[in-house]
Amino acid sequence: MSSSEGVVHVAFLPSAGMGHLNPFLRLAATFIRYGCKVTLITPKPTVSLAESNLISRFCSSFPHQVTQLDLNLVSVDPTTVDTIDPFFLQFETIRRSLHLLPPILSLLSTPLSAFIYDITLITPLLSVIEKLSCPSYLYFTSSARMFSFFARVSVLSASNPGQTPSSFIGDDGVKIPGFTSPIPRSSVPPAILQASSNLFQRIMLEDSANVTKLNNGVFINSFEELEGEALAALNGGKVLEGLPPVYGVGPLMACEYEKGDEEGQKGCMSSIVKWLDEQSKGSVVYVSLGNRTETRREQIKDMALGLIECGYGFLWVVKLKRVDKEDEEGLEEVLGSELSSKVKEKGVVVKEFVDQVEILGHPSVGGFLSHGGWNSVTETVWKGVPCLSWPQHSDQKMSAEVIRMSGMGIWPEEWGWGTQDVVKGDEIAKRIKEMMSNESLRVKAGELKEAALKAAGVGGSCEVTIKRQIEEWKRNAQAN
């Protein structure tokens, strides 16, 4: 067995950003609930303070089940990497530091039963995985739809040697066997479609070509009722020949350790919940466009006008700075005193990190204006809240498509990416009204909530999949 007591021991290696880290820790917590021992390998330093705090709270919550090992990253000259995005730079820094991983793994006192690593680390990990005496698994932290695109890119690239995706992805989009319709070119992450080579594009092409190598399976935070078509296509061998099994282990539940223990955050949530308690059922729009990209000043003004005009109460999380830097100006400086006063009359505006799951679960919240980050998608499904999607970057248009196809949300494609043209306040108000007044969205959201609870509950697909993997790892250990 993998230890003297026969306990399954799983190592997790996440990548950069809360969008990657949070689902990794939720998956690790799920394995812990079923009796596994976890080693968390943490690249240091992290990009943001939020990541460091979350790792600390996770490890403190499971002191007897989790061993934390730091992967101290090598120094990388930013001028040698063609990106200004701090998270893309961190991806590359981690990739260049993976030669340091074997000595770290050698420190483990009990053998590994399995090694689970982030999708952004495939190629540089091959030489490490080759020497491991345990199965290895990818964890794809976005949708099954996005993973299908990722896997299919390797086929397209091999058929078009020497070409960039901007050349071989045409106006008719990406046709994926098993999908009823192609993925539109307009939904492909912009960095991939740049005519000139860039870091994100190179990582995508390099790793998609190696996705079938030394890989025993792929975990995805999704489930049949939400992404049945994509999961069936992936596991039916239609998307990519030789692809290992893809396991839908979602929706992964939020955990108690995710709640911030900082006094400022506790105070912020306390005042938010008090205000929500005073609102009528389903009357509040929750607005959050993610914590990775700041909202442009001109768009903030039109967002404010739209929220005032929509006629509903609102809780608006405003991001004025990238990552976790302190905002140097208040909302009043951006909006002006008159507009700022009107906003405060109608709703609540915060700049701090909030407990999104708690907010979405509050009875007064009737709709979510979201960027479509995959964590946010699974959380809104988990709580059964209709969604208005406004993708900001990367894979978020594909997430918006999942929400729209599910029947629990709307996606105004004409808004484009959040970094493009300013969407006017009257258009924002119109779409919020459409979401909040649409009973069919609410009914479908409720149905998906029930399906999510069933999938994550006793005897559900998530539990069955996790337990099956654990038993397989135990058999492997006995055979060895």
From Swiss-Prot:
Residues reported to bind UDP-alpha-D-glucose: 141, 354, 356, 371, 374-376, 379, 395-396
Catalysis performed (reactions): a 3'-hydro-2'-hydroxy-beta-oxodihydrochalcone + UDP-alpha-D-glucose = a 3'-(beta-D-glucopyranosyl)-2'-hydroxy-beta-oxodihydrochalcone + UDP + H(+)
Descriptive protein name: UDP-glycosyltransferase 708D1
Keywords: Glycosyltransferase, Transferase
Species assigned in the record: Glycine max (Soybean)
GO terms for MF: 2-hydroxyflavanone C-glucosyltransferase activity; UDP-glucosyltransferase activity
Gene behind this protein: UGT708D1
Residue segments, region UDP: 291-292
Effect of residue 292 to A: Loss of catalytic activity
Function, in words: UDP-glucose-dependent glucosyltransferase catalyzing the c-glucosylation of the A ring of 2-hydroxynaringenin. Also active toward phloretin, but not toward naringenin and apigenin.
UniProt: an anthocyanidin binding residues: 20
